[in-house]
Amino acid sequence: MKKILPILLVAVLALTGCTTKNQYAGTYTGTFKFFKFATTDISQGATSSDSKSGKMQFLTNPLTNGLFLYSVIPLSSVTPEQYVSNSGMLDYLDLLLDNIGYQNNVYNSATEYIKNIGITVVFNGNSVHAEVQYEIALIGGVLTSRITIVEFDGTR
């Protein structure tokens, strides 16, 4: 028994000290906030917003131990000129979030991109905050800026 106890203790400590992306997998229920823009020039900022209840789901990718963000967000297009909040047109956002969940929660966030749409996800315990942002070019494309068009706050 004296020989087994230290081995068992080391095994338990190894399992508890090493976190993986699996700890963030699951369904988060919360509120989507859709920002509205008065003109096609979204750099002027949002004029109002709508909120709707919804869910975001994170699935584990067994090949890379990453997370798939699987979420249904009404985005009629990836261009702000055609973006209408709550338009009813659904795009599925399947993103592989690879840089989440290293040992001891050193990292608990990731940003991934689809074309000029960026998704930033931050986990905090059983809570998640996600932002969908549109990248716009400024000064002839020399500089870029990101404008938030959708936010999500939820808990597991």
Predicted regions and their residues:
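Edge beta-strand at a domain terminus
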Residues: 125-156
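Short, solvent-exposed aromatic-acidic interface loops
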Residues: 33-36, 70-77, 133-139
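Contiguous, well-ordered beta-strand patches that form the walls/edges
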Residues: 58-125, 155-156
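Short, solvent-exposed loop/hinge segments that bridge or flank secondary-structure elements
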Residues: 25-68, 111-118
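Flexible, membrane-facing loop/turn or short amphipathic-helix motifs
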Residues: 35-43, 106-108, 135-145
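N-terminal helix-cap/turn-to-beta initiation motif at the start of protein domains
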Residues: 17-31, 122-125, 156
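Sec-dependent bacterial lipoprotein signal peptides
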Residues: 1-18
